[in-house]
Swiss-Prot record:
Protein name: Peptidyl-prolyl cis-trans isomerase CYP40
Cell compartments where the protein resides: Cytoplasm
UniProt record similarity statement: Belongs to the cyclophilin-type PPIase family.
Native species: Arabidopsis thaliana (Mouse-ear cress)
GO cellular component assignments: cytoplasm
Gene Ontology terms, MF aspect: peptidyl-prolyl cis-trans isomerase activity
Length: 361
């Protein structure tokens, strides 16, 4: 029998983020690993000491320190002051054989020797100074990208995330069963959100380019359905896969041009999503990225004009739209947006003239 595996599905700010898959070292620290496994399945019922379910589901990550770790598992207080193990409030340190030798190590949080409960943390870097003080009992095998997403959530006082980072669901993965990483959102996108989570990493450049197009197309479908958040997620994912393309052999000038054009299109589509959210600054940044790889990207210029308009920078908006019209002088959408910008500029100029006249009355 192999080592036990568990999963945690994470939501950030109420939006499902992805799955973390954890391998437990039940051959080295069986008691500690079993505590975590049963807290994932929730099969032990209510805790006799706290009266709350001995279950991580619905629990949140209450402490996040960038460049160090993310911490959760306080099933009773949800703030780092509580918790309960399946053995009672606390149980002893099992051993310190395993080390905090790299990112993704799963370890018990405590308040001193022999004070293990339900709280745990996942390292985001090597943390050797914790060796001999905290019991390591597992490691993240897939979903480190989700861990990074948690790590980069903005924080408030006492390293508490400003958004709720919640264990939406959790449990055990039976031996030999699918880990649920692929097609996590059940929309037909069969590839994991993060390339590092692929079971096999193909060497062929063509595979990666086809996958980028596949994921981008899923983003476009979500955009058409007005599911802009999921569309944006797909565009970000497509960019992650596109980044891997540059590591592969066989990139000639034609392929390089095609990759840059695709990257420009993805950033343009991402900008469109952000405009729908009202994130004009984010959209503007994406259009700048888009035009680094394709300076004659008409759609990027159009989105840039829209972003400037939303930021009330009408002069910059007019400049972007004028450039777009140079490439597509008959485009009805660009002409309509440009007319609206010019109307706003005319109104502003007229108001300024009125103010000047008042000054000299």
């Amino acid at each position: 029998m192999g080592r036990s595996k568990c999963f945690m599905d994470i939501s950030i700010g109420g939006e499902l983020e992805g799955r973390i898959v954890i391998e437990l070292y039940d051959d080295v620290v069986p008691k500690t690993a079993e505590n975590f496994r049963l807290l994932c399945t929730g099969e032990k019922g209510l805790g006799p000491n706290t009266g709350v379910p001995l279950h991580y589901k619905g629990n949140r990550f209450h402490r996040v320190i960038k460049g160090f770790m993310i911490q959760g598992g306080d099933i009773s207080a949800n703030d780092g002051t509580g918790g309960e193990s399946i053995y009672g409030l606390k149980f002893d340190d099992e051993n310190f054989e395993l080390k905090h030798e790299r990112k993704g190590m799963l370890s018990m949080a405590n308040s001193g020797p022999n004070t293990n409960g339900s709280q745990f943390f996942i390292t985001t870097t090597r943390t050797s100074h914790l060796d001999g003080k905290h019991v390591v009992f597992g490691r993240v095998t897939k979903g480190m990208g989700v861990v990074r997403s948690i790590e980069h959530v903005s924080i408030e006082e006492q390293s508490c995330p400003s958004q709720d980072v919640v264990i939406h669901d959790c449990g055990e993965i039976p031996e030999g069963a699918d880990d649920g990483i692929c097609d996590f959102f059940k929309d037909g996108d069969v590839y994991p959100d993060w390339p590092i989570d692929l079971n096999e990493s193909p060497a062929e450049l063509s595979w990666w380019m086809e996958t980028v197009d596949f994921v981008k197309a899923h983003g476009n479908e979500h955009f058409k359905k007005q599911d802009y958040k999921m569309a944006l997620r797909k565009y970000r994912k497509a960019l992650r896969y596109l980044d891997i393309c540059w590591e592969k052999e066989g990139i000639d000038e034609e392929t390089s041009t095609a990759l840059r054009k695709t990257k420009s299109q993805i950033f343009t589509n991402s900008a469109a999503c952000k405009l729908k959210f009202g994130d004009a600054k984010g959209a503007l940044l994406d259009t700048e990225f888009a035009m680094r790889d394709e300076d004659n990207n008409v759609k990027a210029l159009f989105r840039q004009g829209q972003a400037y308009m939303a930021l009330n920078n009408v002069d910059a908006a007019a400049e972007s739209l004028e450039k777009a019209l140079q490439f597509e002088p008959n485009d009805a959408g660009i002409k309509k947006e440009y007319a609206a910008v010019m109307k706003k500029i005319a109104f502003r100029d007229n108001e300024e003239k009125k103010q000047y006249r008042k000054m000299f009355v």
